[in-house]
């Protein structure tokens, strides 16, 4: 994945990484990860940082090597690139273009892709993503839902690849997926 980065990006990331690699051993602590990323213009939440650490700190030693960091940054930039895709997906669901996905719009789109849903299933899907409780999904809620789903999928893929021997760290992402948007909607 780091092979998707330009030489210029790698140099920039190395410089930022090196600032926090106090002893020059090629690794930073997981606690420093957020600071390094913010110095590069990223603004990860604590939950995102925990998910990222779960992805790369395979030996749970609290250190992240530069190669692992490059992989994280490449994924973060790729996620940023997919913002246009998310906007387009939201427009597909938001049939009346009012900035919200209603239960009726969700049911309509899901039916068009061959997913017949009961009223209860539609209600569950809406409530999973509906942070403000207004009964609809706005764009911000849609993006959070989709990005969280992507992160969970990457973590699950890594676990399967690693043999599933690790458990999730404590924090928001430690809740069972079924309680944290597993049905989160949509794609």
Curated annotation (Swiss-Prot):
Residues given in the record as Ca(2+) 1 binding sites? 21, 23, 25, 27, 32
Q: Which GO terms describe its molecular function?
A: calcium ion binding
Q: What is the effect of changing residue 123 to D?
A: No effect on CAMK1 binding. Decrease in CAMK1 activation. Loss of CAMK1 activation
Result for mutant: residue 71 to N: No effect on CAMK1 activation
Query: N-acetylalanine occurs at which residues?
Result: 2
Per the UniProt entry, the effect of residue 111 to T is: No effect on CAMK1 binding. Decrease in CAMK1 activation. Loss of CAMK1 activation
Q: Lipidated positions for S-farnesyl cysteine?
A: 184
Tissue specificity statement from the Swiss-Prot or TrEMBL entry = Expressed in roots, etiolated shoots and flowers.
Q: Which InterPro entries match?
A: CALM/Myosin/TropC-like (IPR050230), EF-hand-dom_pair (IPR011992), EF_Hand_1_Ca_BS (IPR018247), EF_hand_dom (IPR002048)
Establish whether keyword Chaperone is in the entry. no
Residue spans with biased composition (Basic and acidic residues)?
154-165
Supply the residue numbers of the propeptide(s) excised during maturation. Answer: 185-187
Q: Which residues bind Ca(2+) 3?
A: 94, 96, 98, 105
> Low complexity compositional bias: what residue ranges?
169-178
Keywords (alphabetical) are: Acetylation, Calcium, Lipoprotein, Membrane, Metal-binding, Methylation, Prenylation, Repeat
Q: What is the effect of changing residue 145 to V?
A: No effect on CAMK1 activation
Per the record, membrane topology reads: Lipid-anchor
Pfam families of this UniProt entry? EF-hand_7
What function does this protein fulfil? Answer: Calcium-binding protein that binds and activates CAMK1, a calcium/calmodulin-dependent kinase.
What protein family does this chain belong to? Belongs to the calmodulin family.
Q: What is this protein called?
A: Calmodulin-like protein 1
Q: Which organism is it from?
A: Oryza sativa subsp. indica
């Amino acid at each position: 994945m780091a092979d998707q980065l330009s030489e210029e990006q790698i140099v920039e990331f190395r410089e930022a990484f090196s600032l926090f690699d106090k002893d020059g051993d090629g690794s930073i602590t997981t606690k420093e990860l957020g600071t390094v990323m913010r110095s590069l213009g990223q603004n990860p939440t604590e939950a995102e940082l925990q998910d990222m650490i779960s992805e790369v700190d395979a030996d749970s030693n609290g250190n992240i090597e530069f190669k692992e960091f490059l992989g994280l940054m490449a994924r973060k930039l790729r996620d940023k690139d997919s913002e246009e895709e998310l906007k387009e997906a939201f427009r597909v669901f938001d049939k009346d273009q009012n900035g919200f996905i209603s239960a009726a719009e969700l049911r309509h789109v899901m039916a068009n892709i061959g997913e017949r849903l009961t009223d209860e299933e539609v209600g569950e899907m809406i409530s999973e993503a509906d942070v403000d409780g207004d009964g609809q999904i706005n764009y911000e809620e849609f993006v959070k839902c989709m990005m969280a789903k992507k992160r969970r999928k990457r973590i699950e893929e890594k676990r399967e690849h690693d043999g599933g021997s690790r458990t999730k760290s404590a924090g928001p992402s430690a809740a069972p997926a079924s309680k944290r948007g597993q049905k989160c909607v949509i794609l």
